[in-house]
Amino acid sequence: MPPAVLYIDDSEDNLRLVARILGRYRTDTELLVAPTGQDGLRTAIESRPGLILLDNRLPDATGAEVLQQLASTDVTAQIPVVIISGDSGQSTVDQLLGGGAAGFLAKPFTVPEFIATLDRFL
């Protein structure tokens, strides 16, 4: 079974970009998408992906709030979560990494940076 990546982001442009990158460079990786934190949590519980990519600003929650919910849910607590955000200030990065994020990828990112992130966690 191919590894699955769950991308929690409400931006259709970002979702399309990640889908195109995976379609070209990681055809063995299944992409699951969720536009809200609650949808993402539900999808993570049901699908148990190998990696979760999480936007820091969602319509219903912050990345930190979703990260906390994922960490406190037994079936998702061990899934690595990488925050993807345009807010890459050091205090934000430190807060999210301290809150349990396995990594942080600043927007805009390059294709090699994105692929390296996948390779690190899948």
Regions found by a protein language model. Give the residues of each.
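Hydrophobic/aromatic residues positioned on beta-strands within the core alpha/beta folds
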Residues: 82-84
